[in-house]
């Protein structure tokens, strides 16, 4: 276990982040007075209940067909972290929006919690499209998707096989497959990757025999002098009043931490393969110029077919675009979806 901890620490510390004034403009728990909110539940194709927050602009004509957007939260987070903010801001611009909890996270179904399951995560977005398509005030031909952080890779995976997603946007995207296999900037060796896979397989057997579940470190619960910059960036969001949120029935210390035994599923996740087949549906990749995750948006943009756009936000890091309303380009997102969901 000590060797595993060292390997996971190396993976995390390979992610270099640039420090920023994290709290300036941060508004994760924003509450709009221009939209209504209701909790909804629907089933994915695995017959698992997916829970989301549905936001509808006040005064919208519910006898008309309106454009809609599904919003996905960062990996390890829940809908109350970042995605509710984006969903409300976009709903203020006239879209019906739906911020979902991915299966095994938050209020959505899935046992054991925090299981890594990218195929199911991707299906959750298609299930959200199913749900929106049945609402009388939504135009089923005008539904877009937006994925933040890890959900960026899940919406791309979903959009490749779901043409009902008419416009695809990502913000601070992580390719969760590449991040697990290679670390950032491909700093993880094949031997280290194999060691992690071996540890995950061994832990799977432990759990099969009734042993305790082990978790990938996720966001640290406290800082010390040795804490890597990337962890400090996430800590400033997930472990402070800025963005910290513990779903009912969960332990705060375990939030953001996926199950180790399911790690191999990310190793076998290649969301950018065949990304060009999404064309001619438009894609928008938003990243910060200081984001440690910028390589993933650049890679996706390079591989994607037309029409596509890479939009780089000046002076923004990865987590800045979770909640810093002074940096998040809501005007750009609004114009992208209005232009392509009409």
Which ranges hold each PLM region?
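N-terminal cap/lid segment of alpha/beta-hydrolase-fold proteins
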Residues: 22-64, 322
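Catalytic nucleophile-loop/oxyanion-hole region of alpha/beta-hydrolase
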Residues: 43-45, 79, 105-144, 323, ...
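The serine-hydrolase catalytic nucleophile loop
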Residues: 76-88, 102
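Conserved alpha/beta-hydrolase
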Residues: 89-109
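Alpha/beta-hydrolase-fold enzymes
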Residues: 156-240
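Short beta-strand/loop motif that positions the catalytic acidic residue
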Residues: 278-279, 284-287
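Catalytic histidine neighborhood in serine/cysteine hydrolases
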Residues: 304-319
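Catalytic active-site module of serine/aspartate enzymes centered on a nucleophile-bearing elbow/loop
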Residues: 316-319, 323-342
């Amino acid at each position: 276990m000590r060797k595993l901890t060292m390997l996971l620490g190396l993976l995390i510390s390979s992610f270099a982040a640039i420090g920023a004034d994290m709290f300036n403009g941060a508004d994760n728990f924003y509450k709009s007075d221009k939209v209504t909110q209701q909790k909804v539940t629907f089933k994915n194709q695995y017959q698992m209940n997916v829970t989301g927050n549905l936001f509808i602009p006040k005064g919208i004509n519910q006898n008309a067909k309106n454009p809609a957007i599904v919003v996905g939260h960062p990996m390890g987070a829940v809908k109350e972290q970042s995605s509710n903010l984006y969903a409300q801001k976009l709903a203020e611009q006239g879209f019906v929006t739906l911020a979902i909890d991915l299966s095994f996270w938050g209020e959505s179904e899935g046992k054991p919690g925090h299981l890594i399951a990218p195929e199911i995560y991707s299906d959750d977005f298609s299930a959200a499209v199913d749900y929106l398509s049945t609402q009388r005030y939504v135009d089923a031909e005008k539904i877009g998707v937006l994925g933040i952080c890890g959900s960026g890779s899940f919406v791309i995976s979903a959009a490749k096989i779901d043409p009902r997603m008419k416009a695809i946007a990502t913000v601070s995207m992580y390719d969760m497959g590449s991040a697990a296999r290679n670390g950032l900037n491909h700093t993880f060796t094949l031997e280290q990757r194999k060691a992690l896979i071996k540890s995950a397989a061994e832990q799977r057997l432990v759990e099969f025999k009734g042993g305790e579940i082990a978790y990938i470190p996720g966001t640290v619960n406290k800082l010390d002098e040795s804490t890597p910059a990337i962890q400090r960036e996430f800590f400033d969001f997930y472990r402070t009043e800025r963005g910290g949120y513990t779903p009912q029935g969960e332990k705060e210390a375990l939030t953001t931490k996926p199950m180790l035994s399911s790690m191999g599923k990310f190793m076998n996740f290649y969301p950018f393969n065949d990304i060009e087949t999404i064309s001619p549906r438009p894609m928008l990749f938003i990243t910060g110029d200081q984001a440690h995750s910028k390589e993933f948006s650049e890679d996706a943009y390079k591989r994607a077919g037309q029409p596509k756009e890479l939009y780089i936000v000046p002076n923004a890091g990865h987590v800045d675009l979770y909640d810093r309303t002074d940096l998040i380009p809501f005007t750009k997102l609004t114009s992208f979806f209005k232009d392509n969901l009409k």
